[in-house]
């Protein structure tokens, strides 16, 4: 490495009269030296620079392609999600409408069942009242019949004598005899 550096340093000490050499003093360089240095840099650096630029260009294009593919995929997923959302919204509306109609139907069924139950209860109440009335009437009749029977028995016992018994028996025998003649 030292030899390479020494060779460049020795180039700087060559006499500039009549020979070609590099002037390493940047402030003392002239336009020709600068153009030679630039020419050498362009000639040798052109390939490296174009390779770097091509690599950079390929990476940028690859990144753009990947971004476009990702964008298209995202757009496709967005459209699918929108389609699913529309479908779910339609199903929700359908459920909502069906739910409201189902609620109305159940409400009407409940009202009808309630009216039927009330009607049955009213009929049962009326039947119970009628039954209780009949039972009360029958009890009153039995009581009246018992009192009348007791009164009649009391009257018969108080007024009974053998003559009355004989007349009652003969009247009953006469009634039975008349009935026998009618049936024959």
Swiss-Prot record:
Q: Which family does it belong to?
A: Belongs to the ATPase B chain family.
Assembly notes? F-type ATPases have 2 components, F(1) - the catalytic core - and F(0) - the membrane proton channel. F(1) has five subunits: alpha(3), beta(3), gamma(1), delta(1), epsilon(1). F(0) has four main subunits: a(1), b(1), b'(1) and c(10-14). The alpha and beta chains form an alternating ring which encloses part of the gamma chain. F(1) is attached to F(0) by a central stalk formed by the gamma and epsilon chains, while a peripheral stalk is formed by the delta, b and b' chains.
Where it mainly occurs, coarsely classed, is plastid
Q: Which CDD domains match?
A: ATP-synt_Fo_b
**One Pfam family name from the record?**
ATP-synt_B
Q: Which residues cross the membrane?
A: 27-49
Keyword annotations from UniProtKB, A to Z: ATP synthesis, CF(0), Chloroplast, Hydrogen ion transport, Ion transport, Membrane, Plastid, Thylakoid, Transmembrane, Transmembrane helix, Transport
What topology does it adopt in the membrane?
Single-pass membrane protein
Where found in the cell? Plastid, Chloroplast thylakoid membrane
Q: What does this protein do?
A: F(1)F(0) ATP synthase produces ATP from ADP in the presence of a proton or sodium gradient. F-type ATPases consist of two structural domains, F(1) containing the extramembraneous catalytic core and F(0) containing the membrane proton channel, linked together by a central stalk and a peripheral stalk. During catalysis, ATP synthesis in the catalytic domain of F(1) is coupled via a rotary mechanism of the central stalk subunits to proton translocation. Component of the F(0) channel, it forms part of the peripheral stalk, linking F(1) to F(0).
A GO molecular function annotation here is:
proton-transporting ATP synthase activity, rotational mechanism
Which cellular component terms (GO) are annotated to the entry?
A: chloroplast thylakoid membrane; proton-transporting ATP synthase complex
What name appears for this protein in its UniProt entry?
ATP synthase subunit b, chloroplastic
What InterPro entries does the record tag this protein with?
ATP_synth_b/b'su_bac/chlpt
Additional facts recorded: In plastids the F-type ATPase is also known as CF(1)CF(0).
């Amino acid at each position: 490495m030292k030899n390479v550096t020494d060779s460049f340093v020795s180039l700087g000490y060559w006499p500039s009269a009549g020979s070609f050499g590099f002037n390493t003093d940047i402030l003392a360089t002239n336009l020709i030296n600068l153009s030679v240095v630039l020419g050498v840099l362009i000639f040798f650096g052109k390939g490296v620079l174009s390779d770097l630029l091509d690599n950079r260009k390929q990476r940028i294009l690859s990144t753009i392609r990947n971004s476009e593919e990702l964008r298209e995929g995202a757009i496709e997923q967005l459209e699918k999600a929108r389609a699913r959302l529309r479908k779910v919204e339609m199903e929700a509306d359908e459920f909502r409408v069906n739910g409201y109609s189902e609620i109305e139907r159940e409400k009407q069924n409940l009202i009808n069942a309630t009216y039927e139950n009330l009607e049955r209860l009213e009929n049962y109440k009326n039947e119970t009242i009628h039954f209780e009335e009949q039972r009360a009437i029958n009890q009153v009749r039995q009581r009246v019949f018992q009192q009348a029977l007791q009164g009649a028995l009391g009257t018969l016992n108080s007024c009974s004598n053998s003559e009355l018994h004989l007349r009652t028996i003969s009247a009953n025998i006469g009634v039975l005899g008349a009935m026998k003649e009618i049936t024959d």
